[in-house]
Amino acid sequence: VRSLASVPNEARVLVVDAESTDATASLARERGARVVVWPWAGFVATRRYALALVDGPWTFMLDADESLDATLRVALAALEPPDDVDAYAIPRTTYFCGSPIRYGTWGADAPVRLFRTQRATLVAEPAAGGSAELHERWSVPGHVGSINGTLVHDSYPTFASYRAKFARYTSLEAAGMRGSAPALARAIAVAALRAPWYLIVRSGWRDGWRGAFLAFSSAAYPMVVAWKAWRRA
Protein backbone atom coordinates (compact mmCIF):
# COMPACT_ATOMS: atom_id res chain seq x y z
CA VAL A 1 0.00 0.00 0.00
CA ARG A 2 2.81 2.44 0.87
CA SER A 3 4.42 1.76 -2.48
CA LEU A 4 1.26 2.58 -4.44
CA ALA A 5 0.43 5.57 -2.25
CA SER A 6 3.79 7.15 -3.13
CA VAL A 7 3.15 7.04 -6.88
CA PRO A 8 1.88 10.31 -8.45
CA ASN A 9 -1.88 10.30 -8.99
CA GLU A 10 -1.57 10.96 -12.71
CA ALA A 11 0.62 7.89 -13.29
CA ARG A 12 -0.78 4.78 -14.93
CA VAL A 13 0.04 1.89 -12.61
CA LEU A 14 0.50 -1.75 -13.59
CA VAL A 15 0.83 -4.36 -10.85
CA VAL A 16 1.97 -7.89 -11.65
CA ASP A 17 0.70 -10.06 -8.82
CA ALA A 18 2.30 -13.49 -8.38
CA GLU A 19 -0.91 -15.15 -7.17
CA SER A 20 -0.70 -13.54 -3.74
CA THR A 21 -3.05 -14.85 -1.07
CA ASP A 22 -3.46 -11.58 0.84
CA ALA A 23 -5.30 -8.41 -0.16
CA THR A 24 -2.54 -7.11 -2.45
CA ALA A 25 -4.49 -7.40 -5.71
CA SER A 26 -7.72 -5.94 -4.36
CA LEU A 27 -5.96 -3.02 -2.68
CA ALA A 28 -4.10 -2.24 -5.90
CA ARG A 29 -7.34 -2.26 -7.89
CA GLU A 30 -8.96 0.05 -5.35
CA ARG A 31 -6.18 2.55 -6.01
CA GLY A 32 -6.85 2.43 -9.74
CA ALA A 33 -4.03 0.11 -10.76
CA ARG A 34 -4.29 -2.42 -13.55
CA VAL A 35 -3.60 -5.79 -11.93
CA VAL A 36 -2.32 -8.78 -13.89
CA VAL A 37 -2.08 -12.09 -12.04
CA TRP A 38 0.82 -14.22 -13.22
CA PRO A 39 2.32 -17.35 -11.60
CA TRP A 40 5.68 -16.68 -9.99
CA ALA A 41 8.49 -17.51 -12.42
CA GLY A 42 11.44 -15.88 -10.69
CA PHE A 43 12.60 -12.31 -10.26
CA VAL A 44 14.05 -11.76 -13.72
CA ALA A 45 11.27 -13.47 -15.67
CA THR A 46 8.60 -11.58 -13.75
CA ARG A 47 10.19 -8.20 -14.45
CA ARG A 48 10.57 -9.01 -18.14
CA TYR A 49 6.93 -10.08 -18.29
CA ALA A 50 5.84 -6.86 -16.60
CA LEU A 51 7.82 -4.73 -19.05
CA ALA A 52 6.20 -6.55 -21.99
CA LEU A 53 2.80 -5.36 -20.74
CA VAL A 54 3.75 -1.68 -20.66
CA ASP A 55 2.47 0.40 -23.58
CA GLY A 56 3.78 3.81 -22.50
CA PRO A 57 7.01 5.44 -23.72
CA TRP A 58 8.58 5.49 -20.24
CA THR A 59 8.56 2.91 -17.45
CA PHE A 60 9.28 3.34 -13.75
CA MET A 61 9.92 -0.05 -12.18
CA LEU A 62 9.00 -0.15 -8.49
CA ASP A 63 9.19 -3.11 -6.11
CA ALA A 64 6.54 -3.73 -3.47
CA ASP A 65 8.91 -2.77 -0.64
CA GLU A 66 9.94 0.53 -2.24
CA SER A 67 8.36 3.98 -2.30
CA LEU A 68 9.10 7.43 -3.72
CA ASP A 69 9.93 10.30 -1.39
CA ALA A 70 8.37 13.75 -1.89
CA THR A 71 11.46 15.18 -3.60
CA LEU A 72 11.50 12.39 -6.16
CA ARG A 73 7.81 12.84 -6.94
CA VAL A 74 8.35 16.55 -7.59
CA ALA A 75 11.41 15.84 -9.76
CA LEU A 76 9.50 13.29 -11.83
CA ALA A 77 6.63 15.71 -12.41
CA ALA A 78 9.04 18.36 -13.73
CA LEU A 79 11.24 15.99 -15.74
CA GLU A 80 11.82 16.73 -19.44
CA PRO A 81 14.25 14.05 -20.66
CA PRO A 82 16.73 15.04 -23.40
CA ASP A 83 16.63 12.91 -26.54
CA ASP A 84 19.99 11.29 -25.76
CA VAL A 85 18.95 10.11 -22.27
CA ASP A 86 17.43 6.63 -22.21
CA ALA A 87 17.22 6.10 -18.47
CA TYR A 88 17.69 7.61 -15.02
CA ALA A 89 19.52 6.19 -12.03
CA ILE A 90 17.50 6.72 -8.85
CA PRO A 91 19.34 7.13 -5.52
CA ARG A 92 18.02 4.49 -3.14
CA THR A 93 18.22 4.36 0.65
CA THR A 94 17.66 1.00 2.31
CA TYR A 95 16.28 0.87 5.83
CA PHE A 96 17.32 -1.83 8.27
CA CYS A 97 15.47 -2.28 11.56
CA GLY A 98 13.97 1.19 11.31
CA SER A 99 17.06 3.22 10.35
CA PRO A 100 18.57 4.25 7.00
CA ILE A 101 21.86 2.62 6.01
CA ARG A 102 24.13 5.22 4.43
CA TYR A 103 27.52 3.51 4.41
CA GLY A 104 29.05 0.09 3.93
CA THR A 105 27.95 -2.25 1.19
CA TRP A 106 24.45 -0.74 1.04
CA GLY A 107 25.49 2.90 1.10
CA ALA A 108 26.13 3.87 -2.52
CA ASP A 109 23.07 2.57 -4.32
CA ALA A 110 21.45 4.16 -7.38
CA PRO A 111 19.78 1.55 -9.61
CA VAL A 112 18.30 2.37 -12.99
CA ARG A 113 14.53 2.36 -12.48
CA LEU A 114 13.19 4.95 -14.94
CA PHE A 115 13.81 4.17 -18.60
CA ARG A 116 12.45 4.35 -22.12
CA THR A 117 10.26 1.27 -22.45
CA GLN A 118 11.47 0.25 -25.90
CA ARG A 119 15.15 0.90 -25.17
CA ALA A 120 15.67 -1.06 -21.97
CA THR A 121 16.92 -4.60 -21.56
CA LEU A 122 16.94 -6.52 -18.29
CA VAL A 123 20.30 -8.21 -17.80
CA ALA A 124 20.39 -11.11 -15.35
CA GLU A 125 23.41 -11.29 -13.08
CA PRO A 126 23.83 -14.71 -11.47
CA ALA A 127 25.53 -14.26 -8.12
CA ALA A 128 28.10 -16.32 -6.25
CA GLY A 129 29.11 -18.12 -9.42
CA GLY A 130 25.82 -19.96 -9.77
CA SER A 131 23.08 -19.96 -12.38
CA ALA A 132 20.19 -18.72 -10.24
CA GLU A 133 18.82 -15.46 -11.67
CA LEU A 134 18.21 -13.49 -8.47
CA HIS A 135 19.85 -10.20 -9.37
CA GLU A 136 19.52 -8.02 -12.41
CA ARG A 137 20.11 -4.57 -13.84
CA TRP A 138 18.43 -2.50 -16.52
CA SER A 139 20.67 -1.70 -19.47
CA VAL A 140 20.09 0.96 -22.14
CA PRO A 141 22.16 1.97 -25.19
CA GLY A 142 21.93 5.71 -24.49
CA HIS A 143 22.98 7.92 -21.61
CA VAL A 144 21.82 7.36 -18.04
CA GLY A 145 20.85 10.59 -16.32
CA SER A 146 20.54 11.52 -12.66
CA ILE A 147 17.55 12.89 -10.79
CA ASN A 148 16.87 14.43 -7.39
CA GLY A 149 15.02 12.50 -4.74
CA THR A 150 15.25 9.12 -3.12
CA LEU A 151 13.76 5.70 -3.57
CA VAL A 152 12.99 4.42 -0.07
CA HIS A 153 13.68 0.69 0.30
CA ASP A 154 12.07 -0.66 3.47
CA SER A 155 12.66 -4.36 2.99
CA TYR A 156 14.06 -5.25 6.41
CA PRO A 157 11.93 -3.77 9.23
CA THR A 158 13.03 -6.50 11.67
CA PHE A 159 15.82 -9.00 12.21
CA ALA A 160 13.35 -11.75 11.41
CA SER A 161 12.59 -10.29 7.98
CA TYR A 162 16.30 -9.96 7.20
CA ARG A 163 17.04 -13.47 8.40
CA ALA A 164 14.19 -14.93 6.33
CA LYS A 165 15.32 -13.21 3.12
CA PHE A 166 18.97 -14.08 3.79
CA ALA A 167 18.04 -17.75 4.18
CA ARG A 168 15.81 -17.72 1.10
CA TYR A 169 18.28 -16.02 -1.22
CA THR A 170 21.29 -18.06 -0.17
CA SER A 171 19.32 -21.28 -0.68
CA LEU A 172 18.15 -20.19 -4.13
CA GLU A 173 21.68 -19.27 -5.20
CA ALA A 174 23.13 -22.48 -3.78
CA ALA A 175 20.60 -24.49 -5.79
CA GLY A 176 22.20 -23.18 -8.99
CA MET A 177 25.78 -23.99 -7.96
CA ARG A 178 27.99 -27.03 -7.97
CA GLY A 179 29.40 -27.18 -4.46
CA SER A 180 32.90 -28.29 -3.56
CA ALA A 181 35.30 -28.11 -0.64
CA PRO A 182 37.79 -25.87 -2.52
CA ALA A 183 34.98 -23.45 -3.44
CA LEU A 184 33.90 -23.32 0.19
CA ALA A 185 37.47 -22.68 1.34
CA ARG A 186 37.82 -19.79 -1.13
CA ALA A 187 34.51 -18.33 0.02
CA ILE A 188 35.63 -18.44 3.65
CA ALA A 189 38.87 -16.64 2.78
CA VAL A 190 37.02 -13.98 0.79
CA ALA A 191 34.53 -13.44 3.64
CA ALA A 192 37.39 -12.87 6.07
CA LEU A 193 38.74 -10.11 3.82
CA ARG A 194 35.43 -8.51 2.94
CA ALA A 195 34.16 -8.03 6.49
CA PRO A 196 36.82 -5.46 7.52
CA TRP A 197 36.62 -3.89 4.06
CA TYR A 198 32.88 -3.23 4.44
CA LEU A 199 33.24 -2.19 8.07
CA ILE A 200 36.29 0.09 7.85
CA VAL A 201 37.12 1.04 4.26
CA ARG A 202 33.46 1.41 3.24
CA SER A 203 32.73 3.10 6.61
CA GLY A 204 30.05 0.66 7.70
CA TRP A 205 30.89 1.54 11.31
CA ARG A 206 29.27 4.94 10.75
CA ASP A 207 25.88 3.21 10.77
CA GLY A 208 26.48 1.94 14.31
CA TRP A 209 25.59 -1.59 15.32
CA ARG A 210 23.43 -1.95 12.21
CA GLY A 211 26.38 -1.16 9.99
CA ALA A 212 28.62 -3.59 11.86
CA PHE A 213 26.05 -6.36 11.61
CA LEU A 214 25.53 -5.77 7.88
CA ALA A 215 29.28 -5.65 7.22
CA PHE A 216 29.73 -9.14 8.63
CA SER A 217 26.51 -10.62 7.27
CA SER A 218 27.13 -9.22 3.77
CA ALA A 219 30.68 -10.57 3.84
CA ALA A 220 29.39 -13.96 4.98
CA TYR A 221 26.70 -14.18 2.29
CA PRO A 222 28.82 -15.87 -0.45
CA MET A 223 30.31 -18.16 2.19
CA VAL A 224 26.84 -19.33 3.27
CA VAL A 225 25.90 -19.91 -0.38
CA ALA A 226 29.05 -21.99 -0.90
CA TRP A 227 28.40 -23.94 2.30
CA LYS A 228 24.83 -24.77 1.28
CA ALA A 229 25.99 -25.82 -2.18
CA TRP A 230 28.72 -28.01 -0.64
CA ARG A 231 26.16 -29.69 1.61
CA ARG A 232 24.00 -30.47 -1.43
CA ALA A 233 26.88 -31.92 -3.43
Regions found by a protein language model. Give the residues of each.
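Acidic helix N-cap motif at the loop->helix transition within catalytic regions
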Residues: 1, 22-31, 71-72
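Short, structured coil segments at secondary-structure junctions
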Residues: 9, 31-32, 55, 140
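Short, well-formed alpha-helical segments that are part of the catalytic scaffolds
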Residues: 1-9
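Conserved donor nucleotide-binding strand/loop of the catalytic core
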Residues: 25-53
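A conserved acidic beta->alpha catalytic loop
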Residues: 6, 17-27, 63
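Cofactor-binding loops of NAD(P)H-dependent oxidoreductases
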Residues: 38, 62-64
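Catalytic-site signature of metal-activated, phosphate-bearing donor transferases
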Residues: 45-51, 58, 62, 69-233
